[in-house]
């Protein structure tokens, strides 16, 4: 099957351009099989603040205590995921909400105890994806469960998207709140591993963009076709990425 993994960042969900859902529907009509992964950071932040729960970050990852995990799962599974699924279904696009627990879509391996209940997805169940995408567009929340402890784990949505894309040998579109990787205040149309290494050394790629582009290269090395970072609030962003019409940053080896 010809898969395309589309990751929609939490900060992008409220500003997603109205044409994006239609673009995704068009992929299905072109015998392509989109898979949507979403985050929900701003919604989680708001819920934690409302409930008076401190939220700490370590190495760009949310330190996830039991209390933080409970709220995170409520927001991602109970609010963000069904809202996105409903938005698509309202446009007559057959979609189905999932997380790692459903149909044993994937297992979780804990990252490091300093992050609390933060894990990495493993054992992606491609048979489930193959079956579902024949009729539906999966919309996957970045929550999973440890096989042995049965405890829920928070997963970075980028990490989940990369893992699924490399498992399926698919391209990945990262729809973000930025137009791409900025170098000298301009979007860099194409980057490869050597470019990325040099720009990091020159501190032109910095902060949270460093792990994003490094993880992109790693995903490509393990099977992902390519990674494109683009702004989710751009009109027809998905179609423009697919047809190579000059949007965002394309990362290749």
From Swiss-Prot:
Enzyme Commission number(s) of this protein: 2.7.2.8
InterPro entries: AceGlu_kinase-like_sf (IPR036393), AcgluKinase_fam (IPR004662), ArgB (IPR037528), Asp/Glu/Uridylate_kinase (IPR001048)
Binding of substrate, residues: 40-41, 62, 154
Annotated metabolic or biological route of this protein: Amino-acid biosynthesis; L-arginine biosynthesis; N(2)-acetyl-L-ornithine from L-glutamate: step 2/4
Principal subcellular localisation of the protein: cytoplasm
Keyword terms: Amino-acid biosynthesis, Arginine biosynthesis, ATP-binding, Cytoplasm, Kinase, Nucleotide-binding, Transferase
Matches recorded under Pfam families: AA_kinase
Cellular compartments annotated: Cytoplasm
Gene Ontology MF terms in the entry: acetylglutamate kinase activity; ATP binding
Biological-process GO terms, alphabetical: arginine biosynthetic process via ornithine; L-arginine biosynthetic process
Site, as annotated: Transition state stabilizer: 7, 212
Signal peptide segment: none
Reactions that this protein is recorded to catalyse: N-acetyl-L-glutamate + ATP = N-acetyl-L-glutamyl 5-phosphate + ADP
Lineage top rank: taxon: Bacteria
Enzyme class: transferase
Family label: Belongs to the acetylglutamate kinase family. ArgB subfamily.
Function: Catalyzes the ATP-dependent phosphorylation of N-acetyl-L-glutamate.
Name under which the protein is recorded: Acetylglutamate kinase
């Amino acid at each position: 099957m010809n898969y395309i993994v589309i990751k929609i960042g939490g900060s992008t969900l409220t500003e997603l351009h109205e044409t994006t859902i239609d673009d995704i529907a068009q992929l299905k009509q072109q015998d392509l099989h989109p898979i949507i992964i979403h985050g929900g950071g701003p919604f989680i932040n708001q819920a934690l603040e409302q409930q008076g729960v401190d939220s700490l970050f370590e190495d760009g990852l949310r330190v996830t205590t039991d209390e933080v995990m409970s709220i995170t799962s409520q927001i991602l599974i109970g609010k963000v995921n069904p809202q996105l699924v409903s938005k698509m279904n309202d446009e007559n696009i057959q979609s189905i909400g999932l997380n790692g627990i459903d149909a044993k879509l994937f297992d979780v391996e804990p990252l490091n105890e300093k992050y609390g209940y933060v894990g990495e997805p493993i054992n992606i169940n491609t048979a489930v994806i193959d079956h579902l995408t024949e009729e539906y567009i999966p919309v996957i929340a970045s929550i999973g469960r440890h096989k042995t402890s049965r405890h829920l784990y928070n997963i970075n949505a980028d990490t989940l998207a990369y893992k699924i894309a490399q498992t399926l040998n698919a391209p990945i579109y990262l729809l973000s709140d930025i137009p791409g990787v900025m170098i000298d205040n301009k979007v860099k149309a194409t980057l490869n591993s050597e470019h990325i290494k040099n720009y990091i050394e020159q501190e032109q790629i910095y902060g949270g963009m460093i792990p994003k582009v490094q993880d992109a290269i790693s995903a490509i090395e393990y099977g992902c076709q390519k990674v494109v970072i683009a702004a989710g609030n751009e009109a027809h962003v998905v179609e423009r990425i697919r047809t190579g019409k000059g949007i965002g940053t394309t990362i290749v080896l």
